[in-house]
């Protein structure tokens, strides 16, 4: 029994008391849902209504605002945009060619500010933010064979934006939170500590809703992507070739596409659908543009280092498994093929830092920062090395440099709290910890530490 709990309180969770609670929870949950479930939009691919709380110019503005905060963080995680101006311009050109085919009936939110970048990440993937910011990884470009396949990749991501898939997922997550908020409201009104548990369930539910596209959404994106590429003059076989390529890569190395398939679930059904659509709906258009020569010419610098990218991918996998020595070795082998590659240098820095070799970590991260001044992750590793060395002033300097490029990052606030504490600046430390808890909550180990330090640093009356 908890301190202050009355004898018999637990009986409310059994027999008749349990039924009463369940009925009340359902009423509160329904009330929460009814306040939100007010809107639908027409899915441009299926022609059917889909639930979305985000609509019109207001909804579009919210999606653009959401992406504005998320893009810098994701791009930093992917080691920034490549310095290869030719590859970047080429991918953007293909993307704009597809966007130029769009009609008002193709989109939920008109006139999204589409943009296309290649990011340094070595895993095989492409992704879209709800404002139309679309990124293709170096790992993906190194595997593709022609421009038609690239058009299939970009068309697929454009279709996710046009169908409002992120808005729909956010709306479902909001209603889920409303249901949980209703539950939490009743439990809190009854003085129950179970309200905290209900809140935790809501956070987990929203995370699952927003984590990936559904198989149905993937089918819609495939259909839209093929439509756009055919309109732009590309051979629809490019979509089929892309899917077959991904299946081959996954068969040879399942971990290579783990990240992609976690957000873009692949299936034999998707491949069959694409083959059927090319053979029927687009039967007379299977001799469209493939443009292998243009693709190979514009991606030559990236494909030249394909062997290095595979070594870097191996290093990332080894880092995740805490095999720091092996990760450093793999990254160094990749650097022999691609000297001064930013990702390779950063992997050496991270493996060295995690393995306790701070001097080697600082050296590699400092070189990475010189190679790519806009590469934010180098500043993060330098800050962590400084913290481990108790160089708190240096840590704050590097954290501020990182924050200028990636504003609003929660972990930066946490590390700032540690650095300020190290300097004895309690008020600044408390402010930093408070910022971390506000952005990330107190459920993680870091969040619990920050919340605990907040209490301990509070002025004593």
PLM regions with names:
Residues 171-187, 197-209:
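Membrane-active amphipathic alpha-helices enriched in small hydrophobic residues
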Residues 86-89, 93-94, 109-114, 119-121, ...:
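Extracytoplasmic
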Residues 135-152:
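Short pre-active-site segment immediately N-terminal to the catalytic Zn-binding motif
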Residues 56-57, 65, 80, 208-209, ...:
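Extracytoplasmic and endomembrane cell-envelope/extracellular-matrix remodeling and assembly machinery
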Residues 91, 136, 156, 221, ...:
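Divalent metal-coordination and catalytic microenvironments
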Residues 154-163, 183, 220, 224:
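Active-site His/Glu-centered metal-binding helix of metallohydrolases
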Residues 145-149, 158-175, 187:
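Catalytic Zn2+-binding segment of zinc metalloproteases
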Residues 3, 13, 17, 22-28, ...:
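Hydrophobic or amphipathic, alpha-helical segments that drive membrane association/targeting
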């Amino acid at each position: 029994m908890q301190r202050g709990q009355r004898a018999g309180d637990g009986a409310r969770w059994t027999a008749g008391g349990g039924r009463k609670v369940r009925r009340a929870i359902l009423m509160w949950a329904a009330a929460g849902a009814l306040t939100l479930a007010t809107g639908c939009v027409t899915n441009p691919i299926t022609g059917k209504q889909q639930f979305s709380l985000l609509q019109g110019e207001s909804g579009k503005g919210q999606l653009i605002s959401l992406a504005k905060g998320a893009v810098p963080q994701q791009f930093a995680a992917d080691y920034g945009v490549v310095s290869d101006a030719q590859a970047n311009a080429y991918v953007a050109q293909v993307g704009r060619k597809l966007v130029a085919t769009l009609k008002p009936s193709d989109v939920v939110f008109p006139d999204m500010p589409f943009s296309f970048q290649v990011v340094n990440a070595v895993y095989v993937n492409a992704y879209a933010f709800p404002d139309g910011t679309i990124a293709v990884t170096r790992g993906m470009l190194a595997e593709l064979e022609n421009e038609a396949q690239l058009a299939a990749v970009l068309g697929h991501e454009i279709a996710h934006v046009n169908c409002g898939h992120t808005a729909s997922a956010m709306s479902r997550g909001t209603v889920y939170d409303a249901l949980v908020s209703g539950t939490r409201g009743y439990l809190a009104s009854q003085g129950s500590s179970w309200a905290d548990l209900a809140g935790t369930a809501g956070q987990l539910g929203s995370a699952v809703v927003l984590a990936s596209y559904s198989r149905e959404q993937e089918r819609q994106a495939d259909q839209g992507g093929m439509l756009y590429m055919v309109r732009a003059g590309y051979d629809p076989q490019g979509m089929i070739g892309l899917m077959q390529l991904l299946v081959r890569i996954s068969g040879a190395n399942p971990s290579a596409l783990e990240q992609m398939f976690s957000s873009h679930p692949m299936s034999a059904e998707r491949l069959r659908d694409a083959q059927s659509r090319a053979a029927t709906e687009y039967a007379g258009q299977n001799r469209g543009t493939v443009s292998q020569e243009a693709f190979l010419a514009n991606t030559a610098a990236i494909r030249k280092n394909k062997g290095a990218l595979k070594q870097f991918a191996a290093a990332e996998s080894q880092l995740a498994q805490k095999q720091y020595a092996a990760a450093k070795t793999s990254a160094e082998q990749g650097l022999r093929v691609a000297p001064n590659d930013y990702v390779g240098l950063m992997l050496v820095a991270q493996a060295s830092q995690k393995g306790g070799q701070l001097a080697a970590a600082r050296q590699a991260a400092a070189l990475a920062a010189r190679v790519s001044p806009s590469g934010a992750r180098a500043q993060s590793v330098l800050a962590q090395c400084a913290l481990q060395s108790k160089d708190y002033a240096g840590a704050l300097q590097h954290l501020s440099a990182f924050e200028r490029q990636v504003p609003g990052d929660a972990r930066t606030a946490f590390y700032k709290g540690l650095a300020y504490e190290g300097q004895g600046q309690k008020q600044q430390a408390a402010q930093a910890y408070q910022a971390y808890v506000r952005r990330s909550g107190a459920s993680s180990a870091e969040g619990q530490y920050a919340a605990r330090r907040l209490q301990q640093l509070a002025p004593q009356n």
